[in-house]
């Protein structure tokens, strides 16, 4: 059984080294759509794989951290990086080139960590993020799968510190340790209470 949740954010970037010069040589933006697919082996007490409302908490906070921000590769010139840091309140510094494929791998990596560190209380089954799709436009998307995180050609692109959020983004997190919890060694960080009203 698989469920899907759609998230959206708007952001700008440059995709260096690609054939499309408009993308490689210019700051430009997209209205991104991120589809997150979660797989389970059984349903919970509400006959759900996972309540969609729970997917509007930590997962949504993480994805919305990329909204209305400029994202840049840490291989950009120092002059360019300093310009962004000095003139943008919201920016994300990334250790990977900013293709849709890289975004898909990155979101899969961090959302998997969030789900693994989440404690649910409504008799949920074994949950995993089976894939993530990232759309830059309506015409195409990149999709990453769990097995991609074991592929040496892919997994070297993503790691605990492959993104760094500006202070302006962090200031809007209700939990100032939000990102540190995601990448910490703690196995349980995000707790979700059992629904109050239950029919036996």
UniProtKB/Swiss-Prot annotation:
SUPFAM superfamilies reported for this sequence: Tetrahydrobiopterin biosynthesis enzymes-like (SSF55620)
GO MF annotation terms: 6-carboxytetrahydropterin synthase activity; metal ion binding
Cofactor binding, per record: Binds 1 zinc ion per subunit.
Residues at which Zn(2+) binds: 13, 28, 30
One protein family per Pfam: PTPS
EC number(s) reported in the record: 4.1.2.50
Entry similarity comment: Belongs to the PTPS family. QueD subfamily.
Protein name per UniProt: 6-carboxy-5,6,7,8-tetrahydropterin synthase
């Amino acid at each position: 059984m698989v469920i899907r949740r759609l998230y959206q954010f708007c952001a700008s970037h440059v995709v260096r080294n690609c054939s499309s010069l408009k993308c490689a040589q210019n700051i430009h933006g997209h209205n991104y759509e991120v589809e997150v697919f979660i797989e389970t082996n059984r349903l919970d007490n509400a006959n759900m794989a996972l309540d969609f409302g729970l997917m509007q908490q930590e997962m949504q906070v993480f994805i919305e951290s990329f909204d209305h921000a400029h994202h840049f590769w840490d291989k950009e010139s120092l002059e360019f990086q300093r310009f962004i840091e000095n003139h943008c309140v919201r920016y994300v510094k990334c250790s990977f080139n900013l293709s849709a494929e890289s975004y898909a791998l990155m979101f899969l990596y961090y959302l998997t960590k969030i789900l693994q560190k989440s404690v649910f209380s409504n008799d949920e089954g074994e949950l995993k993020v089976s894939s993530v799709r990232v759309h830059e436009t309506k015409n195409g998307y990149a999709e990453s799968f769990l097995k991609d995180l074991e592929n040496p050609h892919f997994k070297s692109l993503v790691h605990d510190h492959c993104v760094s959020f500006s202070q302006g983004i962090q200031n809007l997190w209700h939990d100032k340790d939000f990102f540190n919890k995601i990448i910490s060694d703690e196995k349980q960080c995000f707790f979700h209470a059992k629904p109050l009203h239950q029919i036996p």
